[in-house]
Every structure is written in structure tokens, then in C-alpha cells.
């Protein structure tokens, strides 16, 4: 494909190449705009490539076709029940109301979605919640064959399956050898890289120019305050690119910038589970032109374990801790050797437990946190990459007694022994008397639901030696704060007025769902919706005839 590298720039300039950015670019191009996508990293796709690519999109037709009853009213009631006053109604309504239109539009692009059957909302017992699932969708498998030189320019490694084929989606996580070999020949992938590849293919088909190694450093404005371009830092140095109609920020969050984390987030965060390019570039650019900020204390919280000696995507490798804390025969304890939460709750809700501040000691008592599990857990479910019944990695702490394990992880032995004894008594009674683990439909979904349909899907005694421990860190899938926008993603200033020519979508914007993680895909659902809306709105915005500041140079491209 031939890139549109016109010296006078583009109608719409998009910063970032994750789901939000590529959806915005494709939407703008489909609306008739000349579009350029500029990615900070050398590879495309950002954190979307590392994800499962599940998108939480309520009131969708796939659920209705499967006989699942959902409604606009139910989805809005659900979000409101979790809002704590942090969700702006007009944004929630725009999100829910755009879902049918978005999915019809995606059907005309290379990205095709389908239902992840049975995946419940993360708070299914709340008003409007869906315990039977129906709101989480995933992309169909997509072939990379037609991507040409872009085929090997995506973040991450090939993953040739769908969520439905993994244990969380009801599958085994293993493909028959002949299926795996056929998918390798066809060069098809699912999950995050599959979603990015499909959106990228759509952009290339529409003539969108794609550039890597380009970090946005400043927005360019004319005398009236309209955003008319972007100053980039690339391999050739600083250069300016005109945006006749608008600029869409889709640069991700600020979780990799230590100072921004310190200044804005509500509690400690370590080892982000995202690409290291998420350092708040878009946030800083928006702040410089007077953007109003919102939701700055929040992130898409998630517990992780550090994988010693391993690196991924240019950073310390981590693993999201999901099944290990939800399957039977495991609990989590704080530095005092006490349980402090329902371990099987959704990963975002765990953030609140990690960030509890003790008013007397004025510290965070639940950090560090340790996952404690026994030999039965390892035998039945495996742990941290080890298959069921095999040896766990060498870095996992283990001991033949709880007292010795406590000594090794530096928690009080008497407290740990007492905690485990109380837990085992509760398991015998079939009820977690402290934190109600297993009572929500969601709790058991990631547990051993096939063998144990009730609370036993996540309850199991910690009794068989050897005992194991792994430190768990409060991490994130991205931050949720940034410039406030209207329903079309247009960025607002501190006086609630639109900053002409500036739009935002994805994790760089103030999340339209506030502190809520509605269900699986709670990040990518709004990213797709507001990327779609922002790209379309940017393409339809009248440009300014005035020249941007600085010297216009042809952007660097690979």
C-alpha cells in the first residue's frame, strides 16, 4: 500500500495505535478524511495486543440472538448502581446507545465480533447486572496474510486461539495439533493481536498512513485556540504535522510515569501490566492546552506476580494473577498474616483492598500481599505457568509447614496458622464467614465451576503440604484519568467549553465509566465506542486555514 505522506499533513491525525486509536482512524477514514496514525513505539497495537481483546458492549444483538435479555435501561441502571457519583450520565448514555451502531459498522470492516458465552458481569448481583453473561464480546480469528510488511510489526507474540477456547471461556486452552498447524499456515490469530490486526487491515484498506517511532510532544494551536497539528519527536528529530480537521489522542495512560502515578493515583502501584510507552504523553499535551481533567485517581487495577529473570515488551515480565487466587485451595494474606478480601472477586475491585489505609498506623497494611496455596492446588490446577500435577517454578516459596512458610515470607507464624485454620473451618461449613467468597456468580466463574457448580468452585482447604507462597503486587491494566470529553470525544477545557480540533479516546481520556469495571472487556468496550465516535467527529470538524507553528516536515515512516 502507498502511504499518504503529503507534506501538508492530514485531515485527521491520530496518536496511538491500540484499539481506540485504530478505531478512530478507521472511523475518520470511512467518513472521508485523510488520516495519519502516529505510534510512539516501534511496534503497533500497544497494550491492546497484550489483552484478550474482550470488549464489554451491553445491549448487543449477539446476546439477543442467543436468547439473552438485555436492555438499554438495564445497562444504564447497572452502571449507575456502581457509579458512586463518578459517571457522567451523558457519557454513559452515549456509550450504551452507540453499541448497536458500532457493531453494525464493525461488520463492514475486517473486525468481526462474537459473543463470549456465559461470561457474567463483574458485579452481577447489582441492579441491571447480568449473571448469565451476554455483554462481553471477542473478535473472531483474523488472518495476517494481507498485512504485508506490517505483519511482524505488532506488539507481543502470536496467540492463535479465542477466549472461548481458553479455560475461562469454557475451553481447555489447548488446540489439537492439526488445528494449531492449520492456523499457523493460515497465519490467523485471535485475542489482542487479532483485534489490532483486523483494525489495522481496515485502516490500510482505506489508505490510512501509519508511522512508528513518533512521540507526540506538543499540540499546535492557531490564534483562536484551535488545535491545528502536532509536534512530533521521531528518528529525524522534531517535526510538525498539520491536522486540517482534528487531532485524536489515543496514547494510553500514564502508569509508567512514576511522578504522575504519585501525584494522581489513589494508592500504590507497581509493575504495570501494559506496554512501557504509556508514560502520559497525551495527558501532558492536553494539560498544556488547558484541558479539564477527570477521574485522575483511578486505574484498571489488577493483581500481578513478578516473574523473576524474565522480560517482556522491554520491561520486567509479570503475570496477571487470576485462576491461582480463585481456584480452590488458595487464599491471600497481608503482611500481618491475615486475609483481607474476597480473593475471587474481580481484579479491578481488588484495587480498593490493596489501597486500604490504616488510620492508626498510617500505612497500607495489605501490602505486601502473599498468595498462599497448597499441594492440592498445584496437583489440580497448576500455578504460574506450571501444568496441573507438575512442579511449580523454582522462584515460588515453599515449605513443609505453615510456620516455616511464614518465616520465609516474614509474616507472623501464629497469625498465618490461625488464618488458615479459620479458613479451613469455613470451607468445611461451605461458607466464607469473613468475605463471602463464592457467593457471587462471578466468583466461581474463574474457579473450578465445571467440577463444583456451587461455592465449592472457589472454596477449598489449604491443608496438604508442601505449602507455597508468591508475593502479589497491586498493578494495573492502564490508568483511567485524563482530559474530560463530551459524548463525541471532544476535549473540554476547564470552563466546560470544547477545545476546537482536539479529541480523545481510550485510556488517555477521563474514563466514561468512572471507577467502574462493568465486566470482561470494560476497557476495550468504551475504547472502541469512543474511538469510533471521536474519529467520526474529528473527520466532520471544519478545519482552520491558518498555518500551525513551526516548520512542517514530512513525517518519518517505516
Please tell me what each predicted stretch does:
Residues 1-12, 30, 513, 517, ...:
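Extreme N-terminal leader/targeting segments of oxidoreductases
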Residues 12-37:
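N-terminal Rossmann-like FAD-binding beta1-loop-alpha1 element of flavoenzymes
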Residues 218, 226, 415-512, 516:
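A glycine-rich dinucleotide-binding beta-alpha-beta segment and adjacent secondary-structure elements
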Amino acid at each position: 500500500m502507498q502511504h499518504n505522506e503529503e507534506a501538508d499533513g492530514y485531515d485527521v491525525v491520530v496518536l496511538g495505535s491500540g484499539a481506540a486509536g485504530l478505531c478512530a482512524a478507521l472511523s475518520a477514514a470511512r467518513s472521508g478524511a485523510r488520516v495519519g496514525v502516529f505510534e510512539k513505539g516501534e511496534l503497533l497495537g500497544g497494550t491492546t495486543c497484550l489483552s484478550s481483546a474482550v470488549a464489554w458492549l451491553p445491549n448487543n444483538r449477539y446476546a439477543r440472538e442467543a436468547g439473552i435479555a438485555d436492555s438499554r435501561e438495564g445497562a444504564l441502571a447497572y452502571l449507575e448502581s456502581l457509579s458512586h457519583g463518578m459517571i457522567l450520565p451523558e457519557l454513559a448514555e452515549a456509550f450504551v446507545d452507540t453499541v448497536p451502531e458500532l457493531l453494525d459498522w464493525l461488520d463492514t470492516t475486517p473486525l468481526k465480533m462474537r459473543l463470549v458465552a456465559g461470561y457474567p458481569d463483574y458485579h452481577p448481583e447489582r441492579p441491571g447486572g447480568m449473571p448469565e453473561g451476554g455483554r462481553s464480546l471477542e473478535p473472531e480469528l483474523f488472518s495476517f496474510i494481507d498485512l504485508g510488511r506490517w505483519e511482524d510489526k505488532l506488539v507481543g507474540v502470536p496467540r492463535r486461539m479465542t477466549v472461548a477456547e481458553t479455560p475461562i471461556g469454557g475451553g481447555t486452552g489447548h488446540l489439537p495439533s492439526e488445528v494449531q498447524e492449520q492456523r499457523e499456515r493460515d497465519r490467523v490469530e485471535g485475542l489482542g493481536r487479532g483485534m489490532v490486526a483486523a483494525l489495522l487491515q481496515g485502516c490500510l484498506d482505506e489508505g490510512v498512513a501509519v508511522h512508528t517511532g513518533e512521540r507526540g510532544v506538543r499540540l499546535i494551536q492557531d490564534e483562536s485556540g484551535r488545535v491545528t497539528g502536532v509536534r512530533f519527536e521521531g528518528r529525524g528529530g522534531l517535526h510538525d504535522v498539520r491536522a486540517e480537521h482534528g487531532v485524536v489522542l489515543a496514547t494510553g495512560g500514564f502508569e509508567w510515569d512514576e511522578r504522575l502515578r504519585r501525584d494522581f493515583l489513589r494508592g500504590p502501584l507497581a509493575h504495570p501490566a501494559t506496554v512501557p510507552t504509556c508514560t502520559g504523553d497525551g495527558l501532558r499535551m492536553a494539560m498544556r492546552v488547558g484541558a479539564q481533567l477527570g477521574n485522575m485517581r483511578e486505574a484498571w487495577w489488577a493483581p500481578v506476580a513478578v516473574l523473576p529473570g524474565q522480560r517482556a515488551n522491554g520491561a520486567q515480565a509479570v503475570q496477571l494473577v487470576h485462576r491461582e487466587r480463585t481456584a480452590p485451595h488458595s487464599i491471600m494474606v497481608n503482611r500481618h498474616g491475615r486475609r483481607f478480601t474476597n480473593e475471587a472477586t474481580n481484579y479491578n475491585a481488588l484495587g480498593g483492598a490493596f489501597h486500604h489505609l490504616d488510620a492508626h498506623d498510617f500505612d497500607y497494611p495489605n501490602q505486601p500481599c502473599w498468595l498462599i496455596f497448597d499441594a492440592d492446588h498445584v496437583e489440580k490446577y497448576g500455578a504460574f505457568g506450571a501444568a496441573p500435577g507438575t512442579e511449580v517454578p523454582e522462584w515460588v516459596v515453599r515449605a513443609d509447614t505453615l510456620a516455616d512458610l511464614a518465616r520465609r515470607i516474614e509474616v507472623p507464624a501464629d497469625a498465618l496458622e490461625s488464618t488458615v485454620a479459620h479458613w479451613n473451618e469455613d470451607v468445611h461449613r461451605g461458607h466464607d464467614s469473613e468475605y463471602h467468597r463464592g457467593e457471587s456468580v462471578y466468583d466461581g466463574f474463574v474457579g473450578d465451576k465445571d467440577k463444583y457448580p456451587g461455592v465449592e468452585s472457589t472454596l477449598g482447604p489449604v491443608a496438604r503440604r508442601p505449602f507455597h507462597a508468591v508475593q502479589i503486587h497491586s498493578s494495573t491494566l492502564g490508568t483511567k484519568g485524563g482530559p474530560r470529553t463530551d459524548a463525541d470525544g471532544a476535549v473540554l477545557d476547564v470552563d466546560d467549553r470544547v477545545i476546537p480540533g482536539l479529541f480523545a479516546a481510550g485510556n488517555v481520556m477521563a474514563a466514561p465509566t468512572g471507577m467502574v469495571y462493568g465486566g470482561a472487556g470494560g476497557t476495550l468496550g468504551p475504547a472502541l465506542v469512543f474511538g469510533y465516535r471521536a474519529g467520526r467527529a474529528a473527520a466532520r470538524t471544519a478545519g482552520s486555514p491558518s498555518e500551525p507553528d513551526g516548520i512542517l516536515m514530512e513525517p518519518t515512516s517505516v
